[in-house]
């Protein structure tokens, strides 16, 4: 088997796995990923905390974050840049309010032809809120410097 064939086989396996995940319920995803309730709404689990330091805190952190239908990520802001990554389920509507600028709406998802994007960047101190537009959405959030609840503020 050539290296390229192996890569294609792995890509096909990933596609099948992601397609299969769409048949899961939100509660099954929460259980399989061992997610816990998040104070802003939804469910999360920290998956990475960089051992490299940026001053007194970790250089970066990453979480899984899931919203069920009817749940919202309440308006909040953090003291660091946050990158949202779409992983599965329905698209997610992310709204960002930075200073006096109008609210920016980003649709996270995998359908580029419907203006969905696989990631979005929220600047430090920008207000943000999110909601799924289906049964559930699984995203990841990467924060740099690393997330600390001391730098988290709910509206």
Residue positions per predicted region:
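Non-catalytic, conserved peripheral segments adjacent to functional cores
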Residues: 17-121, 127-130, 134-137, 141-155
């Amino acid at each position: 088997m050539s290296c390229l064939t192996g890569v294609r086989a792995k890509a096909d396996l990933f596609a099948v796995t992601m397609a299969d995940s769409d048949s899961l319920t939100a509660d099954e995803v929460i259980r399989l990923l061992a997610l816990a309730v998040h104070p802003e709404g939804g469910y999360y689990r920290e998956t990475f905390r960089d051992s490299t330091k940026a001053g007194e805190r970790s250089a970066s952190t990453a979480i899984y974050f899931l919203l069920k239908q009817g749940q919202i990520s309440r308006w909040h802001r953090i003291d660091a840049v946050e990158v949202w990554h779409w992983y599965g389920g329905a698209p997610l509507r992310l709204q960002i309010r930075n200073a006096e600028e109008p609210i920016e709406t980003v649709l996270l998802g995998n359908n580029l032809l419907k203006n969905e994007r696989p990631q979005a960047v929220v600047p430090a101190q920008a207000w943000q809120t999110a909601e799924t537009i289906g049964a559930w959405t699984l995203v990841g959030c990467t924060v740099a410097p690393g997330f600390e609840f001391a730098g988290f503020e709910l509206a």
